[in-house]
C-alpha cells in the first residue's frame, strides 16, 4: 500500500471517515509487525504481506464481504426497529394519550430515569421501547425484566449477577441485567413487586452507577438508563410503607 503524498495510515483514516463500516484489506510488501498492528488499530480488516500463498487473499475478501453484509443487515434491522417504535406508530388519539406521547418524546432526548404508570395492557413497554429507540442510547442494548415474574430470591441475582459459588447451583459467574444493558437501557417492568432490599440496591446503582455481583467484592461500573413501569400507584405504596420513598423519588424524576 503506497499512496502518493500520504502515509498509509492517513489513507486508512480517510477511508474510515468516509465509510466506517467499509472493510479494508491492506496488501503490502512490508512485513513489519509494528506496521501491521498500527494498520489494524486504524481499522484495517486484514493485513496481507506479499508474496502471499494460495487463496489467502480470496479468503480474506470473502470474509470481508460477509462482514460488510452483516453490518448492512444490522443497520437495516435497527432502522426497522427505530421506525416500528416511532412515537407516531403508537395508536391513541385521546388527550391523555397524546400528553403521554409528548412527554415521552421530550424525555427520550434526555438521559433521565423514567417511571411509566398505567393499567395492564396500556402499552407501557411499547412506550419504554419508543423512548429507547428515539434516544441517544438507541445504538446500545435494550434489556427488559418483569419483576413480578421472578421469585424474590431470583430477582436480585438476575438483576445484579453473581460470582461462581455465590449460592448453591452457582457453578459459574454470570452477568446480571444491569451489566447486560451497559451502554443502553434497562426496562424494569412491574417494579412495585420488587422487595425493599433490592430497591435499596437499585437506588445505590442509580446514584453511584456501579454494582457488586452477589458473592463478589469487585465493583463493576455500569452506564445504563433505567425505565421503570408499574400498574400500581407507587405513591400509595409509599404511603402504606410498601415501597421505599427514597427509591420512588429517585425513579420518578420526570416530568
Predicted feature locations:
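Short amphipathic alpha-helix used as the core "switch/output" element in two-component signaling
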Residues: 2-4, 9-21, 38
Amino acid at each position: 500500500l503506497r499512496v502518493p503524498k500520504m502515509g498509509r495510515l492517513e489513507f486508512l483514516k480517510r477511508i474510515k471517515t468516509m465509510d466506517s463500516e467499509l472493510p479494508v484489506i491492506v496488501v503490502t510488501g512490508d512485513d513489519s509487525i509494528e506496521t501491521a498492528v498500527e494498520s489494524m488499530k486504524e481499522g484495517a480488516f486484514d493485513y496481507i504481506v506479499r508474496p502471499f500463498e494460495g487463496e489467502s487473499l480470496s479468503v480474506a475478501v470473502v470474509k470481508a464481504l460477509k462482514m460488510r453484509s452483516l453490518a448492512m443487515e444490522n443497520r437495516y434491522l435497527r432502522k426497522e426497529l427505530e421506525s416500528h417504535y416511532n412515537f407516531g406508530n403508537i395508536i391513541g388519539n385521546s388527550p391523555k394519550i397524546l400528553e403521554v406521547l409528548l412527554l415521552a418524546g421530550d424525555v427520550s432526548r434526555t438521559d433521565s430515569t423514567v417511571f411509566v404508570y398505567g393499567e395492564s395492557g396500556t402499552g407501557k413497554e411499547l412506550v419504554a421501547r419508543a423512548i429507547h429507540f428515539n434516544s441517544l442510547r438507541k445504538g446500545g442494548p435494550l434489556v427488559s425484566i418483569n419483576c413480578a415474574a421472578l421469585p424474590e430470591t431470583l430477582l436480585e441475582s438476575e438483576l445484579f449477577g453473581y460470582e461462581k459459588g455465590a449460592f448453591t447451583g452457582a457453578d459459574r459467574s454470570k452477568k446480571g441485567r444491569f451489566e447486560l444493558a451497559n451502554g443502553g437501557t434497562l426496562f424494569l417492568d412491574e417494579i412495585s413487586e420488587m422487595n425493599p432490599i433490592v430497591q435499596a440496591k437499585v437506588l445505590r446503582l442509580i446514584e453511584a452507577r456501579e454494582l457488586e455481583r452477589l458473592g463478589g467484592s469487585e465493583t463493576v461500573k455500569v452506564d445504563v438508563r433505567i425505565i421503570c413501569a408499574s400498574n400500581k400507584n407507587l405513591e400509595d405504596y409509599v404511603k402504606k410503607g410498601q415501597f421505599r420513598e427514597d427509591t420512588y423519588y429517585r425513579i420518578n424524576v420526570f416530568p
